[in-house]
Amino acid sequence: MLDLIINNRKITVRSSISVLQACESAGYIVPRFCYHEKLSVAGNCRMCLVEIQKSPKPVVSCAMPVAKDMVIFTNTPLVKKAREAILEYLLINHPLDCPICDQGGECDLQDETLNYGSDRGRYYEFKRSVEDKECGPIIKTIMTRCIHCTRCIRFSSEIVGLESLGSFGRGRDTEIGTYIQAFINTELSGNLVDLCPVGALTSKPYAYKTRSWELQKGNTIDFFDGVCSDIIVSTRKSTKNQVKNNKIISVVGDEILRILPNHNDLSKDNWISDRSRYAFDGLKNSRLSADFTAWEDYILELGDRLSMYTYGEVIIDEINGPKISVRTGAMVGSLCDLQGIYFTAQFIKICGGTDLQVGNYRSKINYDILFFYSLNRTIASLNALNTLIILGLNTRYEASLLNTSLRQHQVNRSLTYITIGAYSTLKLKQKHLGNSLRTLISFSENKIKLLNNCYLELNPSIFYSYENTRVKHGGLLQNVIRYLGKKLFTKTLTGERLGIVHSNISSLNFAHLGITAGVRSPLYVDTIKDKQFATLFLVQTEEFKSEKWLSIKDYTHTISLATNEISTLKYDHLVPIQSLYEKNGFLFNIEGKLCKLNKVVSSKSNARSLETFLAALLQFQEDYDFTWEQIWKFEDEINFKSQQDKNIPIFLFNLFNFFEIETSAKVFPFAPTVSNFYLNDIISLNSTTMGECALFFTEDSNFQTDI
């Protein structure tokens, strides 16, 4: 610790920080353009100049380390004049197009010029202009506005690991670009827009739509992957009304215009993936609407609470009254919260059935204890890793922020990452050993010389993908992983060395609720179609393989409960439900933390939540006794369940049990776990922006994933 004097005030700071960080810790604001706390120091904008006693000229505070008994001044006439001169220099070639710039109202250059700049300009020469670059469907460039802060270059090389952006030219001919014409191909490209302090990089889907002061902001949780980052959803009220018989029935709900990252407590990063940021426009395309005339009339006459009862009557009437029975099943897609899964499970249980699962294939995983279906550590604790073994997992596309954190820790500490599985460019320095189970078995038997010392490392860990537990030989893979886990845990009683990564929230919520599909057996894969369902519910399903669910001999009444319509699915009836932006709810993330979803936008259609639909359906079945109070008690039950999970011991030796395998232990290759990052759920499949990203950024693969 060092003692400093800042503006005649004595403070104590750490010896490892810069002058700028010391000033901020003391509460003094220092303007900057190039400096960012998550990036390396560049020091080329010169906006953060401060005066230091006994220094002949102003000092760049972001690049100057603190020293003992240093005396710093941030508001002297010398500092003010220097900042004014720097701003005048930066504005020499900057265009005067603030009225049409999407950055207007949120522009750092506007704010700094107002606070520290001059009220007049003295430049009368020709301004230079720079040709705009084509970076893809996400980023719109107006390069004449660029002030060469190099934030975008440092982000792409340090955070993403993509060495495509750089600066070239000298003096007034300096430009930032991709050297040769190319798109910025990364799943984190939208963060470049947030980093740009001026309007040089703006969001192409958001272009010319609104101004920042017109937006209403709400905080919620991202639900497109298992990390569940904190996000800020910006909406705008619509002035259009729905009119019927010269009466205003309802005001059209809010419209989502933009999603930005909030401060993430998990990884302490302010990044989100492009799918989390831009997939919301899928709710505008092929959105299901509830055109129940009788229901709308009841809303006007009885009010919103009583309309739920009439909702059940109308639903029953609209879908010709399917009778629920023991032969009732449900398949849940990747975007379903705890309430939806909980009430779907209760619904199937009341019907007397057991057939409920996520996707077309059942996972061969043990849901009895948190240790077997959780990451078993926080993302922030990744800095304690020495060696990480990644088994059949594409961290870049299954958990983008997890991959970013792994890269950051590798850059800072020179970590070793070992991958076994389908090769993919994770933007990590990795040793890829092979693509089959043979490699994993050899490693578990200590037959790989390269990894002989892995068991002797202080803290080796294993991450593997939930998706690989759903393939035909998932049970065999679980056996090998459990054998390897038992070997690694021989000398340390900790559960942090073995973790499973879920790519979607539905599988996490299933696991935490302890819901297991069908018979408790790993052999339960293809027998489900012999059930001959009378009624089958598809909940937010992005894919449905009828040959795995339905018997050709028997007709099944199929009902799709979804926010959007997928033309490739086969169903008898479509029932609209609310999206997770339009309701309050709960979900678990990969750390096992219970997160709360907040309603940030109202539904444009008359859709209700999934649990309301199922409750209404049960309400009007003659053979079942169901009360509406069960819905309102859900929050208490979930809180109790989460508290129970915390009390379960995370590690026990006798839980390393092995599955019985009907087939011989033969080698099989790891299939790619993500076929298309941009089109991976029912909302993104309907997103125009995600469709363009998939067209420009994805590569075709002939690898058969259905094995």
Label every model-predicted segment.
Residues 45-65:
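N-terminal single-stranded DNA-binding subdomain of primase/primase-helicase replication proteins
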Residues 64-72, 594:
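Acidic/polar active-site rim loop that often engages polyanionic ligands
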Residues 1-24, 32, 36, 51-55, ...:
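N-terminal export/assembly segments and adjacent metallocofactor-ligating motifs
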Residues 28:
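Glycine-rich N-terminal segment of FAD-binding domains in flavoprotein oxidoreductases
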Residues 360-646, 706-707:
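Non-catalytic alpha/beta scaffold blocks inside enzyme catalytic domains
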Residues 39-40:
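AMP-binding (ANL) adenylation modules
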